[in-house]
Structure formats: structure tokens, C-alpha cells
Design a protein with these regions (language model features):
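Bacterial N-terminal signal peptides
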Residues: 2-16
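Cyclophilin-like peptidyl-prolyl cis-trans isomerases
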Residues: 16-192
Length: 192
């Protein structure tokens, strides 16, 4: 068979295959006492992490929670690897759902760019109801980065689409070490 015919037949065969559609990003809004943050969650690349986050959203467990931690370049004197994030959590007194498996950036292909949403964790497979938002590029939070000694990084799962100025306003709140003195209330987190 001639090479041109083979290419033509291959092109026809590919067109005949059913289209593979990735899930569309899921839009959410995080309403805080300092303003709103809009974001898109990437369930196509981080399905386990997005499902976990949405479980808390749909159960309204982030409503009444807060941003309690602000990490800046100046308030981590004992850390050789510096990062910049704000960290939020579910409302006090709400039970955590079971922890989830870590979806490392080496698997998802997502990276910790400015405005990335990611899950906080201690060890691998321990993430539950705390998340953070990055300020600036944070490659040390990716797989192979050195912020967590295990080198597994953190599970990035979304990105801020509007409201980075609110993220920076939260980061600028007065802190005692890295704890925000008057935590910023999460009024509501909802799908848009």
C-alpha cells in the first residue's frame, strides 16, 4: 500500500473515533470578610483533590472557616526554602472527611504558579480540609521541591481567576509568627 494512502486512511480512522472531552474547569467563589476570590478547579488533572474540595464546599463546611495563616518571605526565619502562601480551613467544629491520596504535580502536570489552589498536608495521603493559595511562583511546592522533606510536593488543583488582590490583602494581615492575629473569615465557598 502506498504511504499516502496509509496516512489518508489513518486520518479518516482518527476522525471516526469518538471525541474525548476533558471535564470543564469547575468555577467557585470564596467569599471572605476582605472580598471575593474566584477560582477554577481542574478536575481533569486532579480529580481526587477536586472531588475532596467540592465535598467540603457542597457540605458548606468551609462556610464560617477562615484564612488563619500567612507565610511571607520575612516570617519564616528557620526555613531554608522560602514560600509565600495564605492558608485556609473549614469551620471550627466541623468534622473532617477521610484524608485523600496525594495527587503529586508529577502526575497531574499542574504547577504552583501565582494564585494556585493546593491542599495543605503533613505527610503524603493526609490532606483533608485545609488548603492554601500561592502568591508568586512556588516551584518548591511541586513534586521534587524541597519545602516538604519527603519531596512529594503538594496537590495543586485549581487557580485564582479573579481576586488576587484579595489574596494579597489577606497575606498582608498582621501576624504572630505565621498565624494571622485576626483570622480572615470565609463567609461562604460555593460553586458558580
Amino acid at each position: 500500500m502506498k504511504p499516502g494512502i496509509v496516512v489518508w486512511l489513518a486520518a479518516i480512522a482518527i476522525r471516526a473515533l469518538p471525541a474525548q472531552h476533558s471535564p470543564r474547569p469547575i468555577a467557585i467563589v470564596i467569599e471572605t470578610s476582605l472580598g471575593s476570590i474566584e477560582a477554577e478547579l481542574d478536575s481533569a488533572h486532579a480529580p481526587v483533590t477536586v472531588a475532596n474540595f467540592l465535598r467540603y464546599v457542597d457540605a458548606k463546611r468551609f462556610d464560617g472557616g477562615n484564612f488563619f495563616r500567612s507565610v511571607t518571605l520575612s516570617n519564616q526565619p528557620n526555613d531554608s526554602v522560602k514560600i509565600e502562601v495564605i492558608q485556609g480551613r473549614a469551620a471550627a467544629g466541623t468534622a473532617a472527611f477521610p484524608s485523600i491520596a496525594l495527587e503529586p504535580t508529577s502526575v497531574t502536570g499542574l504547577r504552583h504558579h501565582d494564585g494556585t489552589l493546593s491542599m495543605a498536608r503533613a505527610g503524603p495521603n493526609t490532606a483533608t480540609n485545609q488548603f492554601f493559595i500561592t502568591i508568586g511562583e512556588q516551584p518548591q511546592l511541586d513534586f521534587g521541591g524541597h519545602r516538604n522533606p519527603d519531596g512529594q510536593g503538594f496537590a495543586a488543583f485549581g487557580r485564582v481567576t479573579s481576586g488576587l488582590e484579595v489574596v494579597r490583602r489577606i497575606q498582608a494581615q498582621p501576624v504572630n509568627a505565621q498565624t494571622i492575629v485576626a483570622p480572615v473569615t470565609i463567609l461562604r465557598v460555593a460553586r458558580r
